[in-house]
A protein has these predicted regions:
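Short beta-strand elements of extracellular/lumenal beta-sandwich folds
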Residues: 52-67
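Terminal connector regions
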Residues: 19-23, 87-90, 106, 110-148
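Short, acidic/polar linear motifs in exposed loop/turn regions
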Residues: 45, 63-69, 113, 130
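Short, low-complexity, glycine-enriched hydrophobic/amphipathic alpha-helices that associate
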Residues: 1-14
């Protein structure tokens, strides 16, 4: 009780702070000067379908349209729909791409023995050592199971 007279009352202070809204799809790094062009799909039997037990190629050009050279470029090819029995070759890193130059990149996509008929959706983009990410391209390709 003796303390009640000498102790000041604690007042609650509410501080409202505002933070910028984060949008998860945006890159928080410098925009990339890289652009993916001329995407082509080539399969062994030329039917424009990924068949079971077939090796296919995905070929595209990476163009440096930025103001500076790009370093440690990693082309990324993702299968978005998580279709099973599809194998994509590991990415090969491109160590240096001068401003205004282009490089042609080839990835292998293999259909496994147990591949099902359906549609696979792929996303292709590049990342750089500074964290910059290029614009992503999405496209779909039909898949077909093996017929006995």
């Amino acid at each position: 009780i003796g303390n009640a007279v000498t102790t000041p009352r604690q007042e609650k202070v509410v501080v409202e702070e505002s933070y910028p809204e984060r949008i998860p799809s945006e890159s928080y790094y410098a925009p990339s000067g890289l652009r993916i062009t001329n995407i082509r799909f080539i399969d062994d039997n030329r039917n424009h379908t990924i068949d079971a037990e077939e090796n296919c190629k995905l070929v595209f050009d990476i163009v440096n349209e930025g103001d500076v050279s790009a370093y440690n470029i990693t082309p990324v090819i993702e299968e978005v729909t998580e279709m099973k029995h599809l194998a994509i070759s590991p990415s090969a890193q491109i160590s240096y791409l001068p401003q205004g130059d282009r490089v042609r990149y080839t990835a292998t996509i293999a259909g496994g023995k147990r591949l099902k008929t359906g549609e696979a959706v792929f996303r292709v983009y590049t990342t750089e050592s500074n964290g910059a990410v290029s614009e992503a391209h999405e496209f779909s390709l039909p898949t077909a199971k093996r017929y006995k």
